[in-house]
Structures are given as C-alpha cells and as structure tokens.
Regions:
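Conserved beta-strand segments of alpha/beta enzyme cores
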Residues: 43, 126-127
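Thiamine diphosphate
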Residues: 1-77
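Short acidic-hydrophobic, aromatic-tinged amphipathic segments that line or gate anion-handling sites
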Residues: 129-133
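Aromatic/hydrophobic pocket-lining residues that form the small-molecule binding cavity
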Residues: 7, 81, 137
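Glycine/threonine-rich beta-strand-loop-alpha-helix active-site module
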Residues: 76-126
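Conserved small/polar residues in nucleotide/adenosyl-binding loops
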Residues: 141-144
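A short acidic, often aromatic-flanked loop/helix-cap motif at beta-alpha or helix-coil junctions
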Residues: 50-54, 134-139
Length: 144
C-alpha cells in the first residue's frame, strides 16, 4: 500500500468534513494542496483580498448550510481575516481557517511576515490548532 503524502492526507480530511468550496489566496505554502483540489471535488475561489475570501465563505456557509474553508497568506493576509472570522464567530458560522506560518526553526524570531496567529484568533474561534509536525496533520483534523 502506498503512503499518502501530507497534502493528500490533508485533502482527505477536508473531504471527510464535507468541504467542497475554499475561498482565499493561494501562495507557495498551499500550492501542493491546491493541486489536489480538482480531483478531490473541492472548488477553490481565488479572491483579490483575504478579507473578501472570509466574507464570501461566511456568506456561502450561511446560505447553504455547508461548511467552507478560508485560505490566507502570511502576515497581512492573516490579519485581513480578523473581521470576517469574528463576524462568522458572532453568527455561529462554521468555517475552517487555514493559514501558513513562518518555518518552525524561525518562529518567534521575527520570521518573514510572522504573526502570532494563535493569540490573534483565540477570542474568535471555537477551536484552533497549530501543526508543527506534518505527520500529525490527519490526527489534528480528526480530533475534536
């Protein structure tokens, strides 16, 4: 039996949770995952600004009742999600927010566009997790 890549495991978990639509901006950290989306039945909606992606995801989920995903890029892309994520939180809209982070060995040292994401979103989400070991990705997204 062939081993799954981290990207394949991540997309499989998205499918398990019924994610069919993702909104946002894809950068280099997310490209290997987005390459798998079409075959997995996930439509990615590229937007001009991460804030727009978050607002569209919130609206889509409220209108359809189906959870969607928001993708952002480092630094300003992440901070641009504050308004839509807080709006979704206040409206009890289930969203999955996926953001990249500085490399593990540079975290806390002012890495390129590093943002304290866990602290930034702690009052805006019901659950959050930071993945530092790619081999644990499927465990984190299948645990409550």
């Amino acid at each position: 039996m062939a081993k799954m890549t981290t990207e394949e495991a991540f997309v499989k978990v998205l499918q398990m949770h019924g994610i069919e639509h993702a909104f946002g901006i894809i950068g280099s950290a997310f490209m290997p995952i987005s390459d798998i989306f079409p075959d997995a039945g996930i439509t990615f909606w590229d937007v001009a600004h991460e804030t727009n992606g978050g607002l569209i995801a919130d609206g889509y989920t409220r209108a359809t009742g189906k959870m969607s995903m928001v993708v952002a890029q480092n630094g300003p892309g992440i901070t641009g999600l504050v308004t839509p994520i807080k709006t979704a939180y206040w409206n009890h809209t289930p969203l999955l927010l996926v953001t990249p982070q500085a490399a593990n060995k540079t975290m806390g040292q002012g890495g390129f566009q590093e943002v304290e994401q866990m602290n930034l979103f702690k009052d805006m989400v019901c659950y959050q997790e930071e993945v530092r070991d790619p081999s644990r990705i499927c465990l984190l997204y299948t645990s409550p």
